[in-house]
Amino acid sequence: MNTLFMHCRPGFEGEVCSEIAEHAARLNVSGYAKAKTGSACAEFVCTEEDGAQRLMHGQRFAELIFPRQWARGVFIDLPETDRISVILAHLREFPVCGSLWLEMVDTNDGKELSNFCKKFEVHLRKALLNAGKLVDDPSKPRLLLTFKSGREVFMGLAESNNSAMWPMGIPRLKFPRDAPSRSTLKLEEAWHHFIPRDQWDERLHGDMTGVDLGAAPGGWTWQLVNRGMLVTAIDNGPMAESLMDTGLVQHLMADGFTFVPKQPVDWMVCDIVEKPARNAALLETWIGEGHCREAVVNLKLPMKQRYAEVKRLLERIEEGFKARGIRVEIGCKQLYHDREEVTCHLRRLETAKKTKAR
């Protein structure tokens, strides 16, 4: 079980390889990363039998940027018939698992396996339960089967509290019919990823205020309004009338990079298409100057050296706050709804503590 298998957005396999190789080196896990461009997956093959397990135990999945999902395990070939017997035979070396997910990679070929996986899961789950290899226990590892085809599957394990919260790392979010653009799902997914669900009522509630920089037509503003917040939308373009009719939105025709709120707000969100260094500087300024407590900002990626650029910007942000003497939580992820970009979340810790006395 010396291979770490990872899902990702097609075209970002190289970034996954660079990122996981760096963490493996930090944890003294020897091996090599490999991937095929456009395959929507990557592997890190460890030279030691326990390498993949040590790598997963030493690294929090939520802190990885480009991998959508991961599991440690092995590839096995399957026959056309009686696949279950072959899987059960290989599972003799596996521990009893607490849950089962069948996955496929995010490519056209992978999507064609969706119906097969749905039907096959019913029979496989029954067989695993009867064999005593599957129980309902989240404290036990999750069994992840990623089908590359009907004849090849990666059998892997991952801890449910240190892996993706959705199969393949793809959220099942419904587009709100009254939202003005599909970009609204990007911010909703960011909240799921960066904020524990049991903290939403505390950190995303109707007594809060927010600013949306580059807001038009209002996809991200809609999410803030949907939580009951009073929102200042900054954009020279028009906002959706449905949002303005809520009475919760003030639209200011202004430049998102020069606007400063008269009073500090709880949230700043920004999805402006601009050079990533400029958006990163905006993020540092708003949190550092105390204009907001939490922020979600998208960083558009260059064509080359994308992981290196993201890492450089995150290090610059972190060093900037250290120089200011400000403690912050910094998160960064290429979300499913992101394209050539990553989403950053920052939370100023001192400010968050002070607000509890309100």
Swiss-Prot record:
One of its GO terms (molecular function) is S-adenosylmethionine-dependent methyltransferase activity. Keywords: Cytoplasm, Methyltransferase, rRNA processing, S-adenosyl-L-methionine, Transferase. The active site is at residue 300. Its main location: cytoplasm. The keyword Methyltransferase applies. It is found in: Cytoplasm. Belongs to the class I-like SAM-binding methyltransferase superfamily. RNA methyltransferase RlmE family. RlmM subfamily. Monomer. This is Ribosomal RNA large subunit methyltransferase M. It comes from Pseudomonas fluorescens (strain SBW25).
